[in-house]
Design a protein with these regions (language model features):
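Short, charged low-complexity linear segments at domain edges
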Residues: 1-2, 222
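Cysteine-nucleophile protease catalytic domains, especially the papain-like/related folds used
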Residues: 3-97
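Extended interaction regions within the primary functional domain
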Residues: 7-13, 102, 108, 207-216
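Polar/charged alpha-helical tracts
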Residues: 15, 50-53, 80, 107, ...
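Intrinsically disordered, low-complexity regions enriched in proline, serine, glycine
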Residues: 35, 43-47, 87-88, 131-133, ...
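Conserved active-site-adjacent core of cysteine acyl-enzyme catalytic domains
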Residues: 53-161
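Noncatalytic regulatory segments and standalone regulatory/sensor domains
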Residues: 134-225
Length: 225
């Protein structure tokens, strides 16, 4: 049997990404994907506005910064409202993780991503994303198919907005750069890689550092029982 680097993308979960989202509804839109992925066979497809109205919370077109606990509580309310079975909680939160045992953390994350009855949301930079897969590759081109080589790990994220981490003022400066410095296509490529793709990746090392250094950032788990 041929063994190569471990790579996986949950295409079924990606099908439920609620895109586009309302301007400031990343928390609710990410949860919409989770609800539909886990329970659409029981309750049908729900839009963000539909489930928000049915649990009597605020509309997604209203600007609100709900926080992690609120997102978890919304899920519990949806489960109760539709008489479903499920649970949720923090999957990775810095103070609860043995970061010295990185292989165990990675193994646990992979198992969760591959589990049909579970889905994960990553809270980063005041933004929420679906974790839809992972990708491993060697650090040396001669080891491209050597599964014992030292690895670079990426986490595949499902994006429901045009979230762009580049500040607006910097975006404007980039687009004003003359073509002798950066072509129009290069500027568009930079903006698109930074902002709008429905699927993108972030290095596991960067996510790990983010979760360690930023107290409010975390990975949340939502599971169907």
């Amino acid at each position: 049997m041929i063994t190569i680097h471990d790579r996986y993308v949950n295409n079924e979960l990606l099908q439920f990404i609620s895109r586009p989202q309302y301007d400031t509804s990343c928390s609710m839109s990410s949860l919409t994907a989770i609800i539909n992925y886990l329970y659409s066979d029981q309750i049908g497809i729900k839009t963000t506005k539909e489930w928000a109205e049915e649990i009597e919370t605020h509309s997604p077109d209203i600007n609100m910064a709900p926080g992690n606990q609120t997102v978890l509580e919304w899920f519990r309310m949806v489960v109760d409202k539709y008489n479903l079975k499920g649970n949720c909680g923090y999957f990775i939160k810095d103070e609860d993780v043995d970061w010295d045992n990185n292989p165990e953390v990675i193994s646990k994350l992979k198992q969760a991503v591959r589990c049909r009855n579970q889905a994960l949301i990553y809270h980063m930079s005041n933004h929420y994303n679906i974790i839809a897969g992972y990708f491993e590759n060697s650090q040396n081109p001669d080891d491209a198919y050597n599964n014992k080589a030292k690895l670079e790990r990426w986490i595949v994220l499902g994006e429901h907005s045009d979230f762009n981490p580049i500040p607006k003022i910097i975006q404007k400066l980039i687009m004003k750069l003359p073509s002798k410095i950066m072509s129009e296509d290069a500027k568009n490529l930079l903006m698109e890689r930074a902002g709008s793709p429905p699927i993108w990746c972030r290095r596991w090392g960067s996510i790990r550092n983010d979760l360690i250094s930023t107290p409010n950032h975390c990975i949340m788990s939502f599971r169907r029982e």
